[in-house]
Structure formats: structure tokens, C-alpha cells
């Protein structure tokens, strides 16, 4: 006759015995939707007490469009009311929803709520109500968390022994002297237009394409002035591999030296014409007034156009 060995109980056996209970499969035929909702909507629904029987909303199906509509109640005042519901997976397999609750006998009761039929995503509809709610949330998030509190002036004399010295040490510890910036005005001072044209033609002679930032760092000129001169000789490519880069206009390509000379002559003639007074004499310091005899001597000089 065989002897029965005594069994030894462990803490693990006690733990499983406490959780022992039958799984309720009565709702296995129920089809449920697994819906992913925004976090702010989940927080709003979680704040509703479980004891209150609240109608969260309804689902409206119109042709292929599915929308989630919330109740227009004070509880939903700070959240959007209309959401688009998109079915991401129409055929879900081996996914179930369970519910676990504690009974009076301190045992957990587990029940199957239903079988997942579809997986869906919920996103708010962009309308005036949504913009108003988001604007209110943005203002609340941008509000400073710390406030300045005014403290009444404490009594006592500021000239008390040791008071003046402590104030000077406390204020000088966080006050820093800002050094004046030097050379910035000279760096951005404008140069004559003809000199800037020479520099720009030299830049495009070295490299065919330039960005506005690269030219500004190279020529050290104000951006507005540089762009004004640059637009007269170059174009901004808006497409292709050299998008947002400047290149010379077709009429200046291949004849860069001649084009630069012609533009310099035009700039010089404009500056000279501005210095001629109403008598017709040139009062420019570089070209003093000429007389009739000098004009006759210039008749024998042959002028050649540079192309």
C-alpha cells in the first residue's frame, strides 16, 4: 500500500486561489469597436464620476462618412464637439475586451465584454469651434506659472550699520556691464554702387551660383542695398537644383568684363549729371568746367565703343 505524500502550500498557491473565479463568456458574441481618441478627450471622460449616468455622445453614419458627436452640455464646453471617425482596420482577429471588477468577497470577477470587430481613430473636425477651443487652451498654456508678488516695504532705517554694505553687495552680484559693440557700423557702411557691381561680377566669375546669405557675408553690405543692386544684374532661380540661388542674367553671361565696364560708365554718368548746375558747366570736383577751346581739341579724338 502506497503512502500519500503531504502537500506543501506556497504563497503563490494562495495568490492564485484568491484570484480564482470563472471567466464570464456570456458576451463573446458582442462586437465592439476599438477606438483611439485624443488625450484631452480621454482626460475629459475620465473626469466624469462613474456613478453619474452620462451620455457621452452619439455616432452618426452617413454613406462612407462616420462622425462622433458629443452632447452640447456644460461638461463638454472646453472640448471640440465634432470628430471624424476613421476605420483603420475593418477585420480584426483574436482581439477581445475584458472587464475586471472586485466583488464583496474580495475576489476579482473577470468578464469578457466583447470581440473587437474594427480598429478606429478619432480626430477633431477643424472648424470655428475647434479653433476657439484650441486658442483658449494655447492662452492657458502660455500664461506664466509664476506671479510677481509685491512685498510691503519693511520698516527700519536703511542707514543702519551694515545695511548699506549688504545692499551694495546684493545688487552688484547680478548687474553686469555690457561692453559697447565696436566696428558694427563700419562693417555695414555702404560702398559706391559701381564698386559693389565690380565685386558682384567678380563673385559670379568665381562661382556661377550664389545665395543671398553668402553674398552678404562676402561683400559685407546691408541686405536691402545688396539686393537692390543684385536684382539689376542677376536673377533668383526658383526651381531646379539651384533653387533660391542667384545667377547672372543671360545678357551678362560670357561678357562679364564688358558688362561691368558698361555699368560702371552708366553709374559714373549718372553721378556726373547730378553735379552739373543750371549754367551747363560741370562743377564736379573730378571734372572742372571746360571751355570752347578744349571742346575743339576734343573733336580730333576718336571714341570707340566697348562691346
UniProtKB/Swiss-Prot annotation:
**PANTHER family, alphabetized:** GENERAL TRANSCRIPTION FACTOR IIF SUBUNIT 2
* Record localization: Nucleus
Functionally, this protein is described as follows: TFIIF is a general transcription initiation factor that binds to RNA polymerase II and helps to recruit it to the initiation complex in collaboration with TFIIB. It promotes transcription elongation.
Name recorded for this polypeptide? Transcription initiation factor IIF subunit beta
What are the UniProt keywords, alphabetically? DNA-binding, Nucleotide-binding, Nucleus, Transcription, Transcription regulation
Residue segments, region Disordered:
1-22, 261-307
Leader sequence segment: none
Q: Name one GO biological process term.
A: transcription initiation at RNA polymerase II promoter
**Molecular function (GO) terms listed?**
DNA binding; nucleotide binding; RNA polymerase II general transcription initiation factor activity
Q: According to the entry, what is the taxonomic lineage of the organism?
A: Eukaryota, Fungi, Dikarya, Ascomycota, Taphrinomycotina
* InterPro entries recorded: TFIIF_beta, TFIIF_beta_HTH, TFIIF_beta_N, TFIIF_interaction, WH-like_DNA-bd_sf, WH_DNA-bd_sf
**Known partners and oligomeric status:** Component of the fcp1/TFIIF/polII complex via interaction of tfg3 with both tfg1/TFIIF-alpha and tfg2/TFIIF-beta subunits.
Amino acid at each position: 500500500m502506497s503512502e500519500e505524500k503531504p502537500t506543501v502550500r506556497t504563497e503563490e498557491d494562495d495568490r492564485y486561489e484568491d484570484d480564482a473565479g470563472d471567466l464570464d463568456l456570456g458576451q463573446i458574441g458582442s462586437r465592439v469597436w476599438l477606438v483611439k481618441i485624443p488625450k484631452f478627450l480621454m482626460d475629459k471622460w475620465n473626469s466624469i464620476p462613474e456613478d453619474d449616468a452620462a451620455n457621452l455622445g452619439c455616432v452618426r453614419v452617413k454613406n462612407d462618412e462616420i462622425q462622433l458627436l458629443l452632447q452640447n452640455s456644460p461638461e463638454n464646453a472646453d472640448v471640440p464637439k465634432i470628430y471624424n471617425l476613421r476605420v483603420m482596420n475593418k477585420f480584426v482577429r483574436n482581439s477581445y475586451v475584458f472587464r475586471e471588477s472586485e466583488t464583496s468577497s474580495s475576489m476579482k470577477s473577470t468578464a469578457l465584454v466583447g470581440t473587437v470587430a474594427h480598429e478606429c481613430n478619432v480626430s477633431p473636425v477643424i472648424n470655428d469651434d475647434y479653433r476657439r477651443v484650441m486658442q483658449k487652451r494655447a492662452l492657458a498654456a502660455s500664461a506664466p506659472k509664476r506671479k510677481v508678488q509685491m512685498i510691503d516695504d519693511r520698516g527700519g532705517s536703511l542707514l543702519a550699520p551694515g545695511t548699506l554694505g549688504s545692499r551694495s553687495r546684493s545688487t552688484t552680484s547680478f548687474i553686469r556691464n555690457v561692453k559697447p559693440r565696436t566696428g558694427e557700423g563700419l562693417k555695414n557702411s555702404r560702398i559706391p554702387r559701381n564698386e559693389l557691381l565690380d565685386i558682384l561680377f567678380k563673385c559670379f566669375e568665381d562661382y556661377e551660383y550664389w545665395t543671398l546669405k553668402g553674398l552678404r557675408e562676402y561683400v559685407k553690405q546691408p541686405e536691402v542695398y545688396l539686393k537692390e543692386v543684385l536684382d539689376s544684374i542677376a536673377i533668383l532661380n526658383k526651381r531646379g537644383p539651384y533653387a533660391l540661388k542667384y545667377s547672372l542674367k543671360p545678357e551678362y553671361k560670357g561678357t562679364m568684363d564688358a558688362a561691368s565696364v558698361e555699368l560702371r560708365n552708366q553709374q559714373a554718368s549718372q553721378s556726373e549729371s547730378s553735379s552739373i548746375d543750371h549754367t551747363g558747366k560741370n562743377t564736379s570736383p573730378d571734372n572742372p568746367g571746360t571751355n570752347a577751346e578744349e571742346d575743339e581739341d576734343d573733336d580730333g579724338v576718336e571714341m570707340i565703343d566697348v562691346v
